[in-house]
Amino acid sequence: MSTSTTDTDKYDRQLRLWGEDGQSKLERSHILLLNGSATGTETLKNLVLPGIGSFTVVDNKKVTESDLGNNFFVERSSLGKPRATVVCELLRELNDRVKGFSVEECPIHLINNNISFFKDFSLVVANRLSEEALLTLSQYLTEQNIPLLITNSYGYIGYLRISTPEHQIIESKPDDPIDDLRIYNPFKQLVDMADALELDKLNTQQHSHVPYVLLLIKFLKEWRSTHNDKMPETRAEKDEFKKFFNSHSWSADEMNFVEGIQNLLKYIQPPRVPGDVQNLLKDPKTNITENSDDFWVLVAALKEFMTNNDNTLPLHGNVPDMTSETHNFIQLQKGYQEKALADLSEFSGYVDQILTKVGKSSISSDLVKKFCKNTRFLNIIRYRTISEEYNQPKTNLIKSELEQADTVMVFYILLRGIDKFYKTYHKYPGSSDDFESDIPLLKTVITQYLAEINISNDLVKDDYIAEFVRFGGSELHNIASLMGGVTSQEIIKLITHQYTPLNNTFIFNGINSTAGSYNL
């Protein structure tokens, strides 16, 4: 994507997070929201501002007094008007580059009578839908490979569930990755640069500015020559090497030697392929056919690259800041970049071979390059379907969590009970004037549900049930706003394929500000 000057100015801060490629994916996305509730509109707000391409709101309800109390995207003058139209108009005002559409129709009616309506969206956000509707919708979206996010706020409780068949992550962007400097097994350019060092011929300024990477490579090679070609492994050996390394320093304040000692333990470990990447390489989907998607073609090419490179991943090529004179750093940086380009060229060759073999069209060079630079951070998440969650519940996990003090898992049980209550009584518990009469009814529903999943009902206290009835099906704006932020953040991860989204359920307790995530 070639971002215009205006785009760069408008989206400057987020471009630093997910870059132009991520922004391009956002700007091509079309998000569907089912029900324009407070939680739903807060979610869209946080997607319209960073510049999704377009959104559609499907909602058959009219704006009511309760909407005025919790939804910032309706006004008093909107009372009685179609909620889909009202929230769409106000959301569009946030960003004139984003297109917004409204459909005044019942989401459940669309699901039951026109399911193909959903096939052209990038992602679907569902809010306050029945279990039956969610099962039907999620099954269809799974077949279409379209992510579904179910987000709700109920009183002080927030809930988010992600469902998508397979989410591929190329840029997981871990918080504190270790730079790939190849000190343990340096490539030829690094060895040549280290061997060329004549430290005794340098002046004090030059000696104190030799990059620590080259110092470590040089002195590790010397140390190994007197230790049967072994790297320092035991604690005693590492301490011995530190003394040997420091013995070549001309003064205690040479920062390059200080940096070498500080980074020693990180870089004298044998290179390890991350577990997530190992799992990808073993996946049956690396057996490529003409129907394989690009991600798995690239994984198969990576497998071939590693087979021919002593199980080593392609070099990223980035060099961190370090004490060095400018010309030395540029020379070092050039060595890493040349090796990274050579690895990319070899990797691209394997990609082309695989594509030719199975008769697939080419993969964009930008994607190949991005994949090759991020091979240490690859991952996939295969989500359980909503049907699996409902029909094959993880009883042991749920029971174990319920036995913990102050667990948020209890709210998962209560929310499932609320859905079942609504199915039976066509209302939310506590939404009528005589709310106390709903307490025993909700307790009965929850007791029946717990019996279905073989969990004792004494793990859900009556106080929680009464509190949920007092919520009366209400949405509170502060909880809706928080859940809108959480949901939109996960949507951006899913659309950009950057960072790692949660798997698969998030529950927030606004009463005491605790939260939990579970793979249900």
UniProtKB/Swiss-Prot annotation:
Q: Read off the InterPro entries from this record.
A: APP-BP1, ThiF/MoeB/HesA, ThiF_NAD_FAD-bd, Ubiquitin-activating_enz
Ranges for region Interaction with uba3: 321-334
Pfam families tied to this protein: ThiF
Q: Which UniProt keywords apply?
A: Ubl conjugation pathway
Pathway connected to this protein: Protein modification; protein neddylation
CDD domains given in the database record: APPBP1_RUB
The Gene Ontology CC terms held by the record are: cytoplasm
What domain of life does the UniProt record list for this protein's source? Eukaryota
Additional notes on this entry? Nae1 and uba3 correspond to the N-terminal and the C-terminal part of yeast uba3. In yeast the two subunits form a single polypeptide chain.
Functionally, this protein is described as follows: Regulatory subunit of the dimeric uba3-nae1 E1 enzyme. E1 activates nedd8 by first adenylating its C-terminal glycine residue with ATP, thereafter linking this residue to the side chain of the catalytic cysteine, yielding a nedd8-uba3 thioester and free AMP. E1 finally transfers nedd8 to the catalytic cysteine of ube2m.
Listed name of the protein: NEDD8-activating enzyme E1 regulatory subunit
What organism is the protein native to? Dictyostelium discoideum
